[in-house]
Each structure stands twice: as C-alpha cells, then as structure tokens.
Amino acid sequence: WDGLSEHTRAVLHAADVVFGSARQLSTLPIAAYRLRRWPSPLLPALRSSIEEFDGRWVCVLASGDPMFHGIGVSLAREFGASRLHVIPAASSLSLACARLGWAVHATTTVNIVNAAVTTISPALFDRAHVLVLSRDEHTPAHVVELLRRSGFGGSSVTVLEQLVNPAERLVNVTAAPAGYPVGDALNVVAIECVSDPTYQRLTRVPGLPDSAYSGDGQLTKSEVRSLTLSALAPAPGEHLWDVG
C-alpha cells in the first residue's frame, strides 16, 4: 500500500469491490465487505466473478504489469480492452533485470506458472539470459534440477523473491550443487546459462533428436521430420496433424 501512487489509492478507495489474492488483499486498509478473494482455479470462474458486480466499479489487483503474463491479459480477452483501465507498474522482468544488470531486450522470459518446467529447455543455450516466472516456492528447485539434467549444471542461478517488497531477497546459487532450499512462493528465477561441453541442445527448429521423444519407438527419423517441416514452413498458431 505504501508503494502505491495517490491516484492508485484513490481508485481503490472509490471502487465498489476489489478482487485479488489473499496476499494482495491483506495489504489494503479497506473494509473487508468490499474485498473479494479470487476462486481457485481462477480462469473458469473469471467472467462469472466479475459479472456478479455488473454495473458497479470493480477493481482488480495485479502484481507488477498486469499486461505482462498477468491478469490484465485474461480480462482484456474476456471483456475487451475498451472496458479496462489499466494502471501498470514495473514488471517482474524489468525489476529482475534492474537488480542483475541485464538488458531487458536480450532476456528471454519463460512462464511456467501453468506449464511444465521442461518448457524452459528450448530457451537454454550458452551465455543466454533466461528469466523464469515461477509457479510457487518449489519452482527454483525444479529449475535447478532441469539445468543439471540438460547439460547446464554450471549455470549461475539467482532466485529473486518478493521484488520491491520489504522482504525482498536475492539468493545466488549454482545449478551444480544438489537441490535448492524452499524459499518464498513469490519468486522469479534468473538463469545465466553455461553449457557443459557435451550437452545436446533442444532447439525450436525442426529435427529434434529421437531421444527428445518418449514412445514405443515408432517415430519418423530426425532428418525426414526436419525436411518435411522446413518445406511446410509452419507459422505460429497453425496446427499440424501427422497422420500415419
């Protein structure tokens, strides 16, 4: 609350109802009857939760920039941008890069809040800067384990917890030692990639090695897959059916 602008505080005080997480709502000096905690899972109930207060002034709390992998994207998709008034703050990407001295435009962001940790793999290459948006306090340990398994055991890993909050903490670890102690649930993981000499990289280009797939062994060989996909030249959002 102390870090909010006067304009933002005025908006919150004027709102008929304020939605947010338990952590966010606990920071507000606002009467409890005006506060609404998000249900879990959130997305299936998002529209009905907001429409319950149709015609009233609804305020939604977000961390950082709502339009950077945040609730603002879901609200715009569900209700249209014309119904929103977004008050952004610095994103977790900007804050993390500021702490680490990284260039924002040269840092790859991977969101695994609702995705498997292996989603990070295609972004890993020697000297890459990767910022992982975490699901919870266990995510850093999963990331460190993935790095060790993927041939990036020498990478520098920094866990940034509670950014711009009084409890902010940066923990520097290396992917090589075993495990990472459980910390705060509100965190992002910054990886400065260092590859092992013998690592086998998983890329986004066609022709992943056969070992990257699990199954019964009935798999079109890498060279054929590479040539086929190159000829088809798929674009983002398109769907390919492999019928055989």
Which residue ranges define each predicted feature?
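A contiguous loop/helix-start segment that scaffolds small-molecule binding in enzyme catalytic cores
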Residues: 55-58, 126-218
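Class I S-adenosyl-L-methionine
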Residues: 1-87, 94, 117
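Short, glycine-/small-residue-rich phosphate/pyrophosphate-handling segment
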Residues: 92-128, 135
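Short, well-ordered alpha-helix to beta-strand connector turns
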Residues: 12-16, 32, 127-128, 186, ...
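Conserved beta-strand elements of the Class I
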Residues: 17-19, 59, 108, 131, ...
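Conserved class I S-adenosyl-L-methionine
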Residues: 237-244
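Conserved alpha-helix/loop element of class I SAM-dependent methyltransferases that forms part
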Residues: 219-236
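Solvent-exposed alpha-helices and their adjacent loops that cap or buttress functional pockets
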Residues: 10-11, 52-53, 79, 100-103, ...
